[in-house]
């Protein structure tokens, strides 16, 4: 499915929508220039809503009623809008807007910016002979979703391999599925050297709960091929003995920096590799062709556009990913604004000068790629918290399942001192830091590092971030506001299920468990909340993500996860995933709210998410997505229908086998949602 819109009928030379230029006054302060500085090649179609009678007839479509002042000066004739969205419930995201009266219409200028907002009647003046007018039918128009932590190219690459869809299975059931994959990927013709790589393995999904993966289970498959299961969480890999042999992994293999080769009581590898140890095997897997990757990535970027995502921070980027973005942009198949976060490994984190030179080199090489804006650095501070991985760094030890402390406090991949020096070097050079911090010790390490950087650089607006925040010590809540650190959360995980209950509660105990994903506690402490999906760790379900932030259950949870204490309001949730994340990415002067002068990065939904029942938010469909005034998704186009159908299938596949555990009794269905990269 192509990610660009289907062919559109041009109205006239004047109907083409040009995205905002880098010199836009709307982005003149702290935000970076728009990546859409070149004129758009897309024109807007009439969609049968604009009467051929001209401006007067079109004005009638906007409805009558008492006039109200639009929030921009009048325009007419040649200055008419390219597009007017009318009869809408506009969520502007601008504080105090509602006190001035409801906003029901948005006019998009021919420069790709928002021309005006106001009532239907007030915006009649912006309708010209070739203006397109769209009836929102009372549904929401709002800023596009800003995804502050996502891996879209990883989603594309994963789509090229068979997927276990994070299923919970017995070893026998798993072998049956994998045997089918062997047949589907070449069968006898792939013997003995064709790799079977399977995505979305559930590291806590072997039944009965607590069953540990071992290469001997995979060795029972009827094949001599190397077999590798890639964890859906991005932190675990499970290999058969053939793959271990090819990689030369033995009892004598040491743990690499930032990773772990899991070994059994006999000292031999079990076949499970954690975090950076995965590279021992992954580097040997044959790569897909560039053409295959570009096509797959273009398709998943189209899915993101169909979900209403207009800006993404790709949270794991190196040369490989930047070359893919370059190819996508050159082909006109990059529909979103992309902020690439350059990933530094644990060794690089100890070398600020070398790392800064590395990041600057990549920026120089790729900064002309249209659609990219550089300025972000990514570092892993720890792993994941769930059993059996337990590599997230904790202040207190993990428990053994019977409530007794163990010797394990997880893995801290970078010290506070090293992270502080690294952050200071990059902040001083104008870059932002983005830390993977899942456990409470990793979160504190990030905050300690940012405190050091703030102290030595004197900067008060560095806008560094900590992502995931699965467990935060109460003593650290206020430090986010004090240090100006963004709390980037993936709140689709904040529901009761296998991952938050069976794989976690017995191993950290109820006192710590209460502080899982403490969103409202952070909000009360003054933290700036920002949102991210971590896709493809989960299937892309943007609106269920927002719904779960509000009710702490979502569409597939087994019950509420501390809703009374940690649920967010609807308003906070909408802002978190729009203007909040725009602030994190330093583009709040460009996008994130619906107000004149900002880029027209907008979504038109199929319901009013500001008023519908909370549970109904999960099923929200996106009728139209615009980026810089350019239509990148239309639900009623052939491409749009295909994308919507695929998203619906992914949402349906998201349901997981029944899991009846809960924190305080009850039951229901669990689902995969481990923290990822």
Language-model region placement:
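C-terminal segment of classical bacterial N-terminal signal peptides
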Residues: 60-66
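Acidic (Asp/Glu)-rich catalytic clusters
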Residues: 329, 363-368, 481
């Amino acid at each position: 499915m192509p990610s660009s819109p289907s062919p559109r009928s041009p109205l006239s030379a004047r109907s083409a929508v040009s995205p905002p230029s880098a010199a836009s006054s709307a982005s003149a302060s702290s935000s970076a220039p728009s990546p859409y500085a070149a004129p758009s090649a897309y024109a807007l179609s009439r969609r049968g809503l604009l009467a051929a009678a001209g401006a007067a007839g079109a004005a009638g479509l906007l409805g009558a009623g008492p006039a109200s002042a639009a929030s921009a000066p009048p325009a007419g004739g040649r200055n008419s809008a390219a597009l007017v969205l009318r009869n809408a419930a506009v969520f502007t995201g601008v504080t105090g807007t509602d006190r001035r009266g409801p906003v029901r219409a948005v006019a998009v200028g021919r420069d790709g910016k928002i021309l005006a907002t106001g009532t239907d009647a007030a915006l009649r003046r912006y309708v010209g002979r070739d203006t397109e007018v769209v009836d929102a039918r009372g549904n929401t128009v709002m800023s596009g979703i800003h995804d502050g932590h996502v891996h879209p190219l990883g989603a594309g690459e994963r789509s090229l391999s068979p997927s276990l869809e994070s299923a919970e299975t017995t070893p026998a059931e798993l072998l049956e599925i994998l045997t089918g994959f062997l047949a589907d990927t070449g069968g006898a013709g792939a013997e003995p050297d064709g790799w079977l790589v399977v995505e979305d393995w559930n590291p806590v999904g072997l039944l009965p709960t607590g069953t540990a993966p071992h290469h001997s289970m995979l060795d029972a498959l009827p094949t001599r091929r190397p077999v590798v299961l890639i964890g859906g969480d991005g932190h675990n890999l499970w290999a058969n003995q053939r793959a271990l042999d090819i990689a030369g992994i033995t009892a004598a293999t040491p743990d690499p920096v930032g990773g772990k080769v899991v070994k059994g009581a006999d000292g031999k590898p079990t076949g499970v590799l954690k975090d950076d140890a995965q590279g021992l095997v992954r580097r040997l897997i044959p790569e897909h062709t560039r053409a295959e990757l570009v096509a797959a990535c273009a398709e998943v970027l189209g899915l993101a556009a169909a979900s209403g995502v207009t800006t993404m921070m790709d949270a794991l980027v190196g040369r490989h990913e930047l070359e893919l973005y370059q190819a996508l942009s050159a082909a006109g198949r990059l529909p979103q604004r992309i902020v690439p976060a350059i990933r530094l490994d644990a060794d690089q984190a100890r070398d600020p000068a070398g790392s800064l030179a590395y990041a600057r080199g990549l920026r120089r090489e790729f900064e002309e790629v249209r659609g990219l804006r550089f300025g972000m650095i990514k570092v892993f501070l720890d792993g994941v918290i769930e059993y059996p991985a337990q590599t997230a760094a904790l202040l207190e030890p993990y428990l053994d399942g019977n409530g007794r402390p163990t010797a394990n406090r997880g893995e801290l991949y970078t010290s506070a001192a090293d992270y502080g020096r690294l952050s200071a070097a990059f902040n001083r050079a104008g870059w932002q830091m983005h830390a993977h911090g899942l456990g409470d010790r990793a979160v504190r390490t990030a905050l300690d590092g940012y405190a050091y950087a703030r102290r030595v650089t004197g900067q008060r607006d560095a806008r560094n971030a900590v992502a995931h925040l699965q467990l935060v010590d109460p003593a650290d809540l206020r430090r986010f506001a004090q240090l100006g650190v963004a709390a980037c959360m993936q709140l689709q995980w904040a529901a009761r299920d296998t991952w938050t209950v069976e794989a976690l509660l017995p191993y950290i105990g109820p006192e710590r468990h209460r502080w899982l994903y403490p969103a409202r506690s952070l909000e009360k402490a003054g933290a700036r909340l920002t949102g991210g999906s971590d896709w493809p760790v989960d299937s892309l379900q943007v609106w269920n993500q927002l719904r779960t932030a509000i009710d702490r259950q979502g569409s597939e949870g087994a019950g509420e996860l501390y809703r009374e204490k940690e649920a967010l309001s609807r308003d906070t949730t909408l802002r978190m995933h729009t203007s909040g994340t725009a602030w994190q990415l330093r583009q709040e002067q460009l996008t994130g709210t619906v107000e004149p002068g900002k880029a027209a990065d907008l979504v038109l939904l199929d319901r009013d998410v500001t008023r519908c029942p909370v549970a109904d938010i999960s099923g929200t469909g996106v009728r139209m997505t615009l980026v810089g005034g350019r239509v990148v998704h239309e639900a009623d186009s052939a491409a749009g229908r295909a994308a919507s159908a695929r998203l619906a299938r992914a949402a349906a596949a998201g349901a997981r086998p029944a899991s009846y555990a809960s924190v305080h009794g009850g039951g229901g269905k669990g689902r995969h949602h481990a923290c990822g990269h």
